[in-house]
């Protein structure tokens, strides 16, 4: 019997992806790694099931929880791959290359080769990928290289190097964008190069090209380092918040201990007051009973018989013998 072919489900629509990203932005303190420190697994599972319910509400086919998690993992992998390409290109001092999804670039970044070499298409993130990047806390450095090409050298009538002149056009400066996680704050570093005369020697053009590349690479590295520092500062702020929460819990425990000590002190004070009252009552009772005891003692002394009179000296004997025999 032939095994029926497994029917493949439809790809995730843009609406489903938008719902996944929107829910993860709302529940990032439960599901995103650098926010969910100490969150129990039950809370994470409940959050994922909530996302699954919202996705199934708009999906044309029923989705399972592993599919939603796999889609989120693929989105993160794609965004991190693009960010890694940008970082590698910035650290190498050149613009990032194109990706599979970006294609070969637009008309301004086509593959035609001019005097300055082939232009390279920048890595640009879609708005949805930018939201995912902000959610992951990745610092993005998107470099937009110049699309203008240097015009070929226009030589004069003579072929001598001394008389060679060129016509230079101003090259648009490279702009660096840095997008933060919350609030999407952008930092731009742009500086226009100094204006050049209409006619300049060939050596001046080469010098200007060398000196304009280094500041742009330096600016890109400075922006990347500042992004890393900001991300580390965010992590430090999270740790500081956790420490503050622990300190608040300890303060609450100390207040509870102080309250219990105050209650114990009040109880001891009440016991001391009760003891003082008991002692006062006993002293009053003793003072009341003291004259009664004296009267009772006098009564007993008055009712006791008188002692026998002393015997005569001649009749008193010791050990049963008369006194005359002892003498």
Swiss-Prot record:
Q: Which GO terms describe its biological process?
A: negative regulation of cell growth; regulation of mitochondrial membrane permeability involved in apoptotic process
Q: Which GO terms describe its cellular component?
A: cytosol; mitochondrion; nucleoplasm; nucleus; plasma membrane
Q: Member of which family?
A: Belongs to the NAIF1 family.
Where does the protein end up?
Answer: Nucleus
Cite the entry's keywords alphabetically: Apoptosis, Nucleus
Q: What does this protein do?
A: Induces apoptosis.
Q: Where is the composition biased (Polar residues)?
A: 316-327
Higher taxonomy: Eukaryota, Metazoa, Chordata, Craniata, Vertebrata
The UniProt subunit note reads as follows: Interacts with HARBI1.
What name appears for this protein in its UniProt entry?
Answer: Nuclear apoptosis-inducing factor 1
Q: Where is this region: Required for nuclear localization and apoptosis-inducing activity?
A: 1-70
Compositionally biased tracts (Low complexity): 88-98
Which InterPro entries does UniProt cross-reference here?
Myb_DNA-bind_5 (IPR028002)
Compositionally biased, Gly residues: which spans?
104-117
Q: Outline the segment boundaries, as ranges, of region: Disordered.
A: 88-118, 303-327
């Amino acid at each position: 019997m032939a095994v029926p072919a497994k029917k493949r489900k439809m790809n995730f629509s843009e609406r489903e992806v938008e719902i996944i990203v929107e829910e993860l932005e709302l529940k990032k303190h439960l599901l995103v790694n650098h926010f969910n420190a100490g969150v129990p697994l039950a809370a994470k599972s409940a959050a994922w099931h909530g996302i699954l319910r919202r996705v199934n509400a708009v999906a044309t086919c029923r989705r399972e929880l592993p599919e939603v998690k796999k889609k989120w993992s693929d989105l993160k992998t794609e965004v991190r791959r693009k960010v890694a390409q940008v970082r590698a290109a910035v650290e190498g001092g050149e613009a990032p290359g194109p990706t599979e999804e970006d294609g070969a670039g637009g008309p301004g970044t086509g593959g035609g080769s001019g005097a300055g070499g082939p232009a390279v298409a920048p890595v640009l993130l879609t708005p949805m990928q930018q939201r995912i990047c902000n959610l992951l806390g990745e610092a993005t450095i998107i470099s937009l290289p110049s699309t203008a090409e240097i015009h070929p050298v226009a030589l004069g009538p003579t072929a001598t190097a001394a008389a060679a002149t060129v016509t230079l056009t101003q090259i648009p400066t490279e702009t660096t964008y840095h997008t933060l996680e919350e609030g999407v704050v952008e930092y731009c570093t742009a500086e226009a190069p100094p204006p050049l005369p209409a006619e300049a020697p060939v050596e001046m053009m080469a010098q200007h090209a060398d000196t304009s590349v280094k500041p742009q690479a330096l600016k890109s590295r400075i922006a990347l380092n500042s992004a890393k520092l900001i991300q580390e500062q965010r992590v430090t702020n999270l740790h500081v918040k956790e420490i503050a929460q622990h300190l608040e819990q300890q303060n609450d425990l100390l207040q509870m201990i102080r309250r219990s000590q105050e209650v114990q002190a009040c109880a001891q004070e009440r016991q001391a007051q009760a003891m003082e009252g008991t002692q006062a009552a006993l002293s009053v009772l003793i003072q009341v009973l003291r004259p009664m005891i004296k009267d009772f003692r006098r009564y007993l002394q008055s009712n006791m018989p008188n002692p026998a009179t002393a015997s005569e000296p001649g009749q008193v004997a010791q050990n049963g013998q008369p006194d005359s025999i002892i003498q």
